[in-house]
């Protein structure tokens, strides 16, 4: 006979203690609470400090901006219902939606609220641009000449020079609307007491223990059937400090979702073709898709005496690496072999740039020519990386042995790697680029000669007059089809000149419990919970 616990049936009505001055408990159906762990902790819930995913995810639940991205990275209205861009690309005029309200808060009076207006964006932009506040997102304001609320409904931004990707830039959470009343009330504690317009409102945050968000009952968005969003009643975030503990919580059904997994569990869950193993499919789900992150090896071209200054040598190295084999055996195909350009899948879904395919014969021919032209008998290079990518760089080391290159590996702390590549210290270095905003220009800026490190992201010190002219022309091209053609030409020039070795384009890997519905993935790895529910 099988006995069932008397506590197993009521679908686990859990009790969350909401601390509001005095302790009182509110019972919430467990199926209405979405639980996840943030192993990196959260530093602030103030949008102007949302520079990392750990901050961006909760901020995205609490705040809204002028525009937002859908899962295919198309610009959609958020608090702005419409906008007009001037013909010269310098002026953006936004019309703000009516009757959108901030979360109820004592900062507006006793448990009160007020509607968002254009003045809130003027105030929020000033905060982002205030050097005394030290926002890591202040760089996004460098091309902004002025911004002003013309009235309660119209907000105008004027740029110093045209920038066709500006709407994508505005989708970042830095540009969220915050109420001046709340900032004045909480001062520098606003980041721990956030007030926004988002689908969830702040309830409680015990640092290193738990963050609780509750449903915003006056949220303005509805689903396709006219039902109010969000569906969930609460979000509960824990802060276990390592991915292994996080995975164990997930395995015990104590959290609903994990973003990627610790490498030690990779082979247990993921097959060699990158899919969830059949034996786990009855208990959990895997949602995956392209991630705007390109992993690569950079060549420092600032030293003309260096061997890697030879384009022929760089091409040979690129042809000598079997990226598909690397992805299959080292990463279980979690990601996509970078056999095309530098711009990753997600922005370049057509995959139309012809990149490097494994061609050992061609690589050997190029090396033979390089040795003859430079009177070289032996080629010795040094590749610098941090320890997290040791398996990748050792694979490259073995591949280059096949073309008679002696590659030494220099492992340094991540901080030393960042500093060294900025200062031109390493002839070859492992790096990655995650998009700040969803535009190919963000990747291609790494090869613009006016962006030389340490003052910009051009760590390779690649310089090319044709490239610079094409890159500058993208700023003014408002036609997205024509702009994509320019991006393709630029990406092709990167491959042709090979200042880098594209390794792979990353992939978002989201694991959920079987009863989680409505969670999607997107190339910027944003967490959108307003349409999520649990069966």
Summary of predicted features, one role per range:
Residues 315, 327-330, 406-417, 445-513, ...:
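Extracytoplasmic/peripheral linker and loop segments enriched in polar/acidic and small residues
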Residues 510-535:
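Long beta-strand-rich cores associated with HINT superfamily self-processing modules
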Residues 200, 337-370, 385-391:
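Structural transition elements
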Residues 133-180, 201-206:
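Surface-exposed binding/hinge segments that line
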Residues 335-336, 368-435, 508:
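Ligand/substrate-recognition segments at binding pockets and active sites
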Residues 37-87, 126, 195:
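N-terminal lobe/hinge region of extracytoplasmic solute-binding protein
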Residues 117-122, 152-156, 198-199, 229-234, ...:
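Alpha-helical secondary-structure segments
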Residues 191, 219-272, 406-408:
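Ligand-site clamp/hinge motif
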């Amino acid at each position: 006979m099988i006995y069932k616990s008397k506590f197993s049936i009521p679908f686990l009505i859990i009790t969350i203690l909401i601390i509001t001055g005095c302790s009182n408990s509110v019972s919430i159906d467990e199926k209405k609470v979405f639980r996840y762990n943030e192993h990196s902790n959260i530093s602030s819930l103030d949008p102007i400090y949302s520079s990392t995913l750990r901050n961006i995810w909760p901020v995205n639940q609490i705040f809204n901006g002028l525009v937002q991205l859908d899962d295919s990275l198309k610009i959609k209205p958020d608090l702005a219902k419409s906008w007009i861009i001037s013909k010269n690309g310098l002026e953006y005029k936004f019309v703000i939606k009516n009757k959108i309200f901030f979360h109820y808060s004592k900062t507006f009076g006793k448990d009160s609220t007020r509607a968002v207006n254009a003045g809130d964006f003027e105030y929020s932009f000033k905060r982002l641009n205030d050097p005394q506040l030290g926002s890591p997102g202040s760089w996004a304001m460098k091309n902004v000449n002025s911004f002003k609320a013309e009235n309660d409904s119209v907000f105008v931004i004027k740029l110093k020079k045209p920038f066709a990707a500006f709407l994508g830039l505005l989708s970042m959470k830095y540009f969220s609307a915050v109420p001046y009343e709340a900032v004045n009330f909480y001062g520098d504690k606003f980041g721990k007491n956030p007030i926004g317009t988002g689908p969830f409102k702040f309830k409680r945050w015990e640092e290193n223990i738990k963050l609780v968000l509750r449903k915003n009952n006056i949220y303005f968005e509805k689903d396709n059937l006219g039902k109010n969003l969000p569906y969930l009643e609460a979000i509960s975030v824990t802060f276990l400090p390592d991915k292994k503990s996080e995975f164990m919580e997930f395995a015990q059904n104590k959290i609903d979702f994990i973003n990627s997994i610790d490498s030690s569990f990779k082979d247990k869950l993921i097959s060699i073709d990158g899919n969830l193993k059949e034996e786990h499919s009855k208990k959990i789900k895997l949602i995956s898709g392209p991630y705007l992150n390109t992993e690569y090896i950079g060549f420092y071209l600032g030293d003309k005496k260096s061997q890697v200054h030879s384009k022929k040598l760089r091409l040979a190295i690129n042809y000598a690496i079997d990226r598909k084999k690397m992805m299959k055996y080292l990463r279980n195909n979690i990601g996509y072999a970078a056999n095309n350009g530098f711009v990753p899948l997600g922005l370049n879904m057509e995959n139309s740039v012809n990149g490097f395919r494994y061609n050992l014969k061609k690589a050997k021919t190029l090396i033979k020519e390089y040795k003859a032209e430079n009177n070289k008998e032996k080629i010795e290079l040094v590749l610098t990386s941090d320890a997290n990518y040791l398996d990748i760089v050792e694979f490259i080391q073995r591949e280059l042995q096949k073309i008679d290159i002696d590659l030494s590996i220099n492992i340094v702390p991540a901080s030393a790697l960042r500093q060294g590549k900025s200062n031109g210290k390493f002839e070859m270095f492992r790096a990655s680029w995650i998009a700040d905003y969803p535009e190919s220009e963000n990747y291609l800026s790494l090869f613009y000669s006016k962006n030389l490190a340490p003052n910009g992201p051009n760590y390779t010190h690649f310089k090319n007059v044709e490239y610079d002219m094409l890159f500058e022309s993208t700023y003014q091209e408002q036609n997205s089809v024509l702009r994509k053609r320019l991006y393709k030409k630029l990406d092709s020039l990167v491959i042709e000149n090979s200042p880098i070795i594209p390794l792979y384009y990353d992939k978002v890997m989201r694991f959920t419990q079987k009863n989680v519905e409505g969670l999607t993935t997107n190339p910027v790895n944003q967490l959108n919970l307003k349409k999520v529910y649990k069966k």
